[in-house]
């Protein structure tokens, strides 16, 4: 059997001067002027503002309409399925009364909790 180290090229020797002064191809590359970066003009003009990736949402999702052409999944009957039924215990008033610490609460800032004794 022959020695495999003789058959395999020595890459350490082949690339010893790679990316150095002795590498002519690399030195030619360094002499080139830098390329300008790609510029994408008007990348947000179609959607505008905070509407990215919406595009033609209604037109693209026509297959999701039900029989009555409402938006949603096919045969979407969620709006009339629970009509007239209450969702659990409906004894609570719709609007909660103002908390008694409202005047003290405002002095602590918008999203801060009042001290422990106020609630």
UniProtKB/Swiss-Prot annotation:
<dbReference type="GO" id="GO:0160130">
    <property type="term" value="C:mRNA cap methyltransferase RNMT:RAMAC complex"/>
</dbReference>
<keyword id="KW-0597">Phosphoprotein</keyword>
<feature type="compositionally biased region" description="Polar residues">
    <location>
        <begin position="47"/>
        <end position="61"/>
    </location>
</feature>
<dbReference type="GO" id="GO:0031533">
    <property type="term" value="C:mRNA capping enzyme complex"/>
</dbReference>
<feature type="region of interest" description="RNA-binding">
    <location>
        <begin position="56"/>
        <end position="119"/>
    </location>
</feature>
<feature type="region of interest" description="Interaction with RNMT">
    <location>
        <begin position="1"/>
        <end position="55"/>
    </location>
</feature>
<dbReference type="GO" id="GO:0003723">
    <property type="term" value="F:RNA binding"/>
</dbReference>
<dbReference type="Pfam" id="PF15320">
    <property type="entry name" value="RAM"/>
</dbReference>
<feature type="modified residue" description="Phosphoserine">
    <location>
        <position position="86"/>
    </location>
</feature>
<dbReference type="GO" id="GO:0106005">
    <property type="term" value="P:RNA 5'-cap (guanine-N7)-methylation"/>
</dbReference>
<feature type="modified residue" description="Phosphoserine">
    <location>
        <position position="36"/>
    </location>
</feature>
<feature type="short sequence motif" description="RNMT-activating domain">
    <location>
        <begin position="36"/>
        <end position="42"/>
    </location>
</feature>
<dbReference type="GO" id="GO:0008047">
    <property type="term" value="F:enzyme activator activity"/>
</dbReference>
<comment type="similarity">
    <text>Belongs to the RAM family.</text>
</comment>
<dbReference type="GO" id="GO:0005634">
    <property type="term" value="C:nucleus"/>
</dbReference>
<protein>
    <recommendedName>
        <fullName>RNA guanine-N7 methyltransferase activating subunit</fullName>
    </recommendedName>
</protein>
<dbReference type="InterPro" id="IPR028271">
    <property type="entry name" value="RAMAC"/>
</dbReference>
<feature type="compositionally biased region" description="Basic and acidic residues">
    <location>
        <begin position="62"/>
        <end position="73"/>
    </location>
</feature>
<feature type="modified residue" description="Omega-N-methylarginine">
    <location>
        <position position="85"/>
    </location>
</feature>
<feature type="compositionally biased region" description="Low complexity">
    <location>
        <begin position="89"/>
        <end position="112"/>
    </location>
</feature>
<keyword id="KW-0488">Methylation</keyword>
<feature type="region of interest" description="Disordered">
    <location>
        <begin position="30"/>
        <end position="119"/>
    </location>
</feature>
<keyword id="KW-0507">mRNA processing</keyword>
<comment type="subunit">
    <text>Interacts with RNMT; this interaction enhances mRNA binding and cap methyltransferase activity.</text>
</comment>
<keyword id="KW-0539">Nucleus</keyword>
<comment type="function">
    <text>Regulatory subunit of the mRNA-capping methyltransferase RNMT:RAMAC complex that methylates the N7 position of the added guanosine to the 5'-cap structure of mRNAs. Promotes the recruitment of the methyl donor, S-adenosyl-L-methionine, to RNMT. Regulates RNMT expression by a post-transcriptional stabilizing mechanism. Binds RNA.</text>
</comment>
<keyword id="KW-0694">RNA-binding</keyword>
<dbReference type="GO" id="GO:0006370">
    <property type="term" value="P:7-methylguanosine mRNA capping"/>
</dbReference>
<keyword id="KW-0506">mRNA capping</keyword>
């Amino acid at each position: 059997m022959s020695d495999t180290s003789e058959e395999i090229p020595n890459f350490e020797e082949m690339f010893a001067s790679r990316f150095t002064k002795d590498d002519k191809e690399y030195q030619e590359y360094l002499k080139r002027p830098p390329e300008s970066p790609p510029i994408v003009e008007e990348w947000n003009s179609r959607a505008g503002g905070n509407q990215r990736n919406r595009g033609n949402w209604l037109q693209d999702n026509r297959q999701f309409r039900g029989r009555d052409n409402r938006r949603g999944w096919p045969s979407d009957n969620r709006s009339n399925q629970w009509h007239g039924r209450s969702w659990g215990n409906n004894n609570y008033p719709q609007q909660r009364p103002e908390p008694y610490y409202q005047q003290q609460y405002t002095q602590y800032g918008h999203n801060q909790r009042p001290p422990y004794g106020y609630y």
